[in-house]
Amino acid sequence: LSFYKKKRKISGTMLTKDLLQKEFGKNWQKYYQVGMFKDKGYERKICKSCGRAFWTCNPEREICADSPCVEYGFINNPITKGKWDYVETWKLFEKFFEKNGHTSVPRYPVVDRWRPDLYFTIASIQDFQRVDNGNMNFVYPANPLIVPQVCLRFPDIQNVGITGKHLTSFVMSGQHAFGHPKQKGAYFKDRCLKLNFEFLNGEMGIPAEELVYQEDIWAMPDFSAFGPCMETFSQGLELVNSVFMQFQKEGDWFRDLDMRVIDVGWGHERLVWFSNGTPASYDSLFGPITGKLKKKAGVKVDPTIFDRYSKVAGSLDLGEVKDIAKAKKKVADYVGISQEELRETIEPLQAVYAIADHSRTLLFAMTDGGIPSNVGGGYNLRVVLRRALSFIDKYDLGFDLVEIAKWHADYLKPMFPELQTELDNMAKIVNAEKDKFKETRKKIKASITALVEKDTKFDDALLTQLYESQGITPEEIRKFKPDLEMPSDFYEQLTEKHSSLTEGGEGGKMIANVCATEKLCYLDEFQFDATILKIMDDNLVLDRTAFYATSGGQEHDTGTLDGIKVSDVFKQGEVILHRVEESSKFKVGQKVHGVVDRARRKQLAQNHSAVHLVNGAAREILGNHVWQAGSEVRVDKARLDITHYSAITKEQLKKIEDLVNEKIRRGIPIEKPVVERGRAEQEYGFRVYQGGAIPQKDLRIIKMGDFDVEACGGTHCNNTREIDQVKILRATKIQDGVVRLEFVAGDKANAAKEATKELHEKTLKPLSGLVCEAVLTGYSEEDMNKAAEVFSVPLVQLPITLERFIGEWGDYGDKIKAFGGEALESRVFDADRLSKVAETIFSEWKKRQKLLKDLISKRVQEEMKQLPADQPKMRGIFFGMRMKDLESDSKTPLEKTLEKVKKIAG
């Protein structure tokens, strides 16, 4: 294989990464050699240990600088000219690259809203990748640039705290240049590696002979983009990986990319660790946090023991070690202590390190709108949170995760000031999760005990099932089964399937030989003329249309074409189809006149605009973690699914509705500009992607002042006042972490309010003569809801429920009198509100119910004196059956009950 501007066909074997590595290695002068290597005296060698090619300026070096070919040489012996903490390292990096023509841009969210296939940001280049109808494009705010991108990765969670280097969150200091050679500011391999050397050698002071560059290749899974890459190592640690996106596969042909991209991922944490040389990276990465945690937990480890342990901690990588027990013994032997001593000495410290990492990960995720749940990316956040809580409980550490998160936020404020903004909201989310975990633990004790007593084999499948169905972690099982060995890849398997998602496309198959339909629906046109381009069964394809097609969760318009009813409108790709009742009356090429149903369009626009207002109001009332998780806009009602960590209370629902209607009364103009995607992201932020990533270069923005701004293709009002009013019907928790709000707007809201008033009148009917005038004449929907809550029923069931309770209340009075109790007269309830009346009725109902049971019990006990004392079984059956008979009918003869008892008792 060789790659030139001229296409060259690949024949014979299938392209693989291994094949590319071999071919790139043969032509290393073309793909890996750069000017800096010549200038600094670097030569290419093959590692005698691993066989990989590397570049060094040390003529005596015969082994590369990767581990395990060499041990870490910087531990307790850093070779940099200074020690920089987490923030200082970024400032050093930022200053150098800004001086060399790069723009420093703020980090992007760790919860990815712009890629349809990923939940979390896992690399800095991801910030600038946009998927357009299956094609990858780049959108960037500057060129070249650097970014301190926080990334979340969960496959190695079981190693965090153990190996001394693994993390669930880290900063990838991204160095990127786009579009070489056509874009201004872009550069490629020579300048990239020159900057690499100048920073590491010149700014950090790493001797040139200690910098080793190792050849590799990077490729997209489908080889849509690939190229050589150069990994920079020093003393066993990889510091940076420089990727040169240079080529692409095209069928059986290969060619240069039209524009090349520099994708350099600097390991920020590794640079910090390397310059400080602490035995475990965690002691240098989290500033004062690990010191505070150790002191608070009383964790002390002999420095000599820990130094020896840290040198071999990497061998406990649970993702690579097959026999972890054997590996632990080997480590203990190397350190010179028993396995028991190792466990008692090191494991509490490992827990402290893991908690420091996990709390920071949760802080970033929750600041950016992520919440723990049992679905999607939230699943991984719950795994992290519960692992931290399990460590706190296991070692009785007494830590407060939110307090630790605040320490992180304070320490990182110079880099990430936004972490200060969501601490209160994080506290609410974490406390709700702690309550859920506590309830889970109460329920699981019996389950685990039963499994252990049966000597159940806890294999991978069972452990996964127990976690996913009941939230039972291996750490919990170990409390009952101390010898349990957790599968080395347990958390990797759990989190892997929740790290990405597959999005289904909308609209079905593409229609061949038909141009995209011109859309008139956004112009508020309700009549139009068009030409029929194609007829498919009962569906007409027009060159232009004012009908809105079902999409984005919104129902379609209806109306007529030449007076014939249009019953459905839908999309296939960019083509819109109109289903008509009499397609035989139309022919291709015919001119038709279309009329859109104005009333339906108005109601749909009101409901859709209400969706945006409700979303904004929910975010303001509940917190910034609220994001749209789905929506549906119909004529009869709308629904909005939002991310939230608990059920929404009636009070919160009322506040949301009140805020929505306040915005309606204010008459906010609804702007609908079409904005280039990059500019929209910069101007409005990633909140515009409420409905998920949009595969278009230009976004239609629905802007309701500063209250809510979203990218949306639906039909909307022109001013919030046109929505008229919104009535929220109900809130339902549809899955863990997602709450569904159902509501109506405009005339439908008026109709719903009238229906509630009618319900109020029905509720009052059985109260006539029992309540004061204030209850009969007063009307409050909020008070009606409170009355329904008294009986734990939906509002719609309040009239029949109240009638039933009043009836039973009266029946109890008659029965009490029949069993010799005092006669209870009907009374007038003096409460001035319906909810208070409901509370009194329910309270009196319970009192009468108890009094009646006591009287019946007393009667039955008297009757039992007639039964033989030496037949306890018969007496027991009699008591239960007689109570039941008399509660049903106070006149049930004793003989009838006795007859049934004798049959049962034999």
Regions found by a protein language model. Give the residues of each.
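Short, flexible, mixed-charge glycine/proline-rich loop motifs
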Residues: 34-43, 53-58
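Short cysteine-rich clusters marking metal-coordination/redox-active sites
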Residues: 47-50, 64
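Cysteine-rich micro-motifs
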Residues: 57-72
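Structured aminoacyl-transfer and RNA-binding surfaces used for tRNA recognition/handling
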Residues: 74-382, 392-405, 440, 709
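Extended, domain-scale alpha-helical bundle/helix-rich regions
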Residues: 391-397, 429-509
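Terminal appendage regions of diverse proteins
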Residues: 395, 458-469, 474, 480-481, ...
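Conserved nucleotide-binding/hydrolysis modules and their immediate coupling elements
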Residues: 499-599
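Non-catalytic interaction/regulatory segments
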Residues: 635-636, 642-735
